[in-house]
Amino acid sequence: MLARSAGQYKGHIAVGLVGVPILTDWVIRNKEADFMYDMLKQPDYPGYLHMLNNNATTTWEYWNGERSRVHNCYNGIANWFYQAVGGIRADEKQPGYRHVFIEPQIPQGVTWANTTKESPYGTIIVNWKLQDDCLMMHVVLPVGVEASVAIPVSYTHLRAHETSLHL
């Protein structure tokens, strides 16, 4: 249904700002990184790039820029960047980021990401880049945090450069 809606609106985000967190959750859960990235790249109304092209420094209340231009309360799109592109997701069975899933979803055309997420234990860092058809990942976990790491199937080589790696 979302794909059909995006097609109907010529690839644009087809929800209001209140619907963005719902869309974002669906995209992350269904690993539809290209779907979201294609919508984010649309330069005209309605969309985030439209806001940026019109000098926005915060999320607007309405896609067209009417009314408040400082309306961060519905900025659910940020979740997509650190949960999908960065790949940092909390394990709902172990609240408080005691255990996290590291599983980057790499949209076509994106070649790197530097992602941090503050947790009660400290900063979780996932930096990755594509180089020569190889995915290079750097993951830093604070003491007290465990992670399950999943590498996208397109990139199957793994090389450990840190003190320990348990697979």
Over which residues does each language-model region extend?
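Alpha-helix capping and helix-loop boundary segments enriched in small/acidic/polar residues
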Residues: 10-15, 27, 68-69
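Extended glycan-interaction surfaces of carbohydrate-active proteins
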Residues: 1-20, 38, 44-45, 59
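Non-catalytic C-terminal accessory modules of carbohydrate-active enzymes
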Residues: 34-159
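Well-ordered alpha-helical scaffold segments within catalytic/enzyme domains
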Residues: 22-30, 82-87
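Conserved small/polar residues in nucleotide/adenosyl-binding loops
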Residues: 1-2, 156-163
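Conserved structured core elements
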Residues: 14-17, 30-34, 75
